[in-house]
Every structure is written in C-alpha cells, then in structure tokens.
Design a protein with these regions (language model features):
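Terminal "cap-and-tail" regions of soluble proteins that handle hydrophobic small molecules
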Residues: 2, 9-12, 76, 101-112
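Hydrophobic ligand-binding cavity/cleft-lining segments
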Residues: 1-47
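Short, surface-exposed coil-to-beta transition loops
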Residues: 5-7, 63-68, 91-96
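Glycine-rich portal/gate segments that line the openings of hydrophobic small-molecule binding cavities
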Residues: 31, 40-88, 104-106
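Beta-strand/loop substructures that line and gate deep hydrophobic ligand-binding cavities in soluble
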Residues: 84-112
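Functionally constrained cores in energy, signaling, and assembly domains
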Residues: 8-10, 26, 36-39, 55-56, ...
Length: 112
C-alpha cells in the first residue's frame, strides 16, 4: 500500500529571501496566520526554544481555544522551521514549514 500525504501550501508572490525573513519574524505571525498571537517567550525574532501562545481565528472571530507553538529548529540552509504544536484537548502535532523557490519572484510555502 502506498501512503498519501496531503499538506497545505501557498504560492507567495515574493522572492525566497523575503518570505524567509517574514517566517523568522515571529512577532508578526498574526499578520498572515489565522491566529491572534498573545505571547512570545522569549520576545523577539524566531529562535529555537521560543514558545508562542495563540488563539485561532475563523471568519474574523478570535476563538477561545489556545494553541502553544514550541519552535524546535530553524534550518536556514533548507529554509525550514519545525514546531511542536499543543492543540486543545491534549493533542500535540509536529509541523514543518518549508519555503521552496519557484523562480526569482515567487516562493512555495509548504505546511505539514
């Protein structure tokens, strides 16, 4: 049997370097992620060991369920960050965000 993996992705109309810089600017995640970020420990740019607290948003409404993201690693050479995410009801998942250049002007951002 062949396993199938489905992960969300986005094509961003910006060069890889710009997308990567935005991904490392954790205090601005709420500007592009469907979440309201409420805490960064330590504050500042993304660093391994940083813990972020957020509430999801749907249709412009902030949900009362909190999520915690634990930044595990930043791989600048491969443009990849790895998070352990504590979801409501005791669910934990590991997620990777990877930036892949398409050409000099666009970047694919792969989540999963």
């Amino acid at each position: 049997m062949t396993a199938v993996s489905v992960c969300p992705a986005a094509v961003v109309n910006a060069p890889l370097e710009r997308v990567w810089a935005v991904l490392l600017d954790s205090e601005h995640y709420g500007e592009w992620a469907d979440a309201r970020f409420t805490r960064f420990d330590p504050p500042g740019p993304a660093v391994p060991g940083q813990v972020m607290s957020a509430n999801g948003r749907e249709f412009g409404i902030t949900l009362p369920l909190q999520v915690r993201l634990h930044l595990q690693s930043i791989d600048s050479q491969n443009h990849r960050v790895i998070f352990d995410v504590d979801l409501p009801f005791g669910i934990r998942e590991r997620t990777t965000i990877r930036c892949i250049p398409i050409d000099g002007r666009t970047t694919r951002v792969q989540f999963g």
